[in-house]
A protein has these predicted regions:
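Bacterial N-terminal signal peptides that target proteins for export
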Residues: 2-13
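A structural "domain/chain start" motif
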Residues: 25-86, 202-207
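C-terminal/domain-edge helix-coil "capping" segments
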Residues: 27-41, 143-147, 156-163, 167-207
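Surface-exposed short loop/turn segments
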Residues: 29-31, 97-159, 171-172, 176
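Second-shell loop/turn segments in exported
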Residues: 71-83, 101-103, 176-184
Length: 207
């Protein structure tokens, strides 16, 4: 019994460490776990149920330098749908690639449920604004910041296994502010998260 307890502890620590290890990505890009259920055996899971990205109550925040901008700052439903589509496609591609972990649509004893809710979005440039009045393009370090909450749950019981919440920068390089680079930055952000999740699961399965 003691050996089983210690083994579960190692699996829990291994999962958490690889998921939030500072060596994986830039230090300013970390999300620290808010809570992890003790004694969770993550090796019991080998599939993912990725729920749709929750944008039902996301708030659009202005950056400090745009507080006095008289123009409206808002995000439309098409942009929110784009966020959801990119998230869905990236998660499935990364988690399933090269003999990875199936992304399924129904709960199961070996299925871990992934729920991500976007709490707020702070774009660096007003949505819809692409050029200055002189036709000059904007160059920004990333596209903005998001605040998100992530739950990992037992898909059958809905028991919470891991919770994290924090801010993430959307993109890590100076690029022209245009639709192509905004999409690329979003793909990069979601790829980081999916890769961490994949690496953490590989770790507990000894891959």
């Amino acid at each position: 019994m003691k050996s089983d307890f210690l083994n579960r502890g190692k699996l829990l620590i291994g999962f958490a460490m690889i998921l939030f290890c500072s060596g994986l990505y830039a230090e300013n890009d970390l999300l620290e776990p808010t809570w992890v259920r003790p004694d969770t055996d993550f090796s019991a899971f080998n599939k993912f149920q990725v729920m749709p990205l929750d944008v039902s109550d996301v708030r659009l925040l202005r950056p400090p330098w745009a507080m006095d901008d008289p123009k409206d700052w808002s995000i439309d439903n098409e942009d929110l749908q784009l966020l959801q589509d990119i998230y869905r496609d990236v998660m499935k591609a990364i988690l399933e690639a090269d003999g990875g972990y199936p992304v399924v649509h129904v709960p199961g004893a070996d299925v871990i449920q992934v729920e991500v809710e976007l709490l707020s979005i702070m774009p660096y440039i007003r949505p819809g604004k692409r050029e200055t009045s002189k036709g000059q393009s904007y160059i920004t370090l990333g596209s903005g910041e998001v605040n998100a909450k992530i739950d990992l749950r037992n898909s059958e019981t809905r028991e919470l296994l891991l919770l994290l919440e924090g801010e993430k920068t959307v993109g890590q390089e100076y690029k022209e502010h245009n639709d192509t680079n905004i999409v690329a930055n979003l793909e990069y952000m979601f790829t980081q998260f999916a890769t961490r999740l994949r690496n953490a699961m590989d770790r507990v399965h000894g891959k």
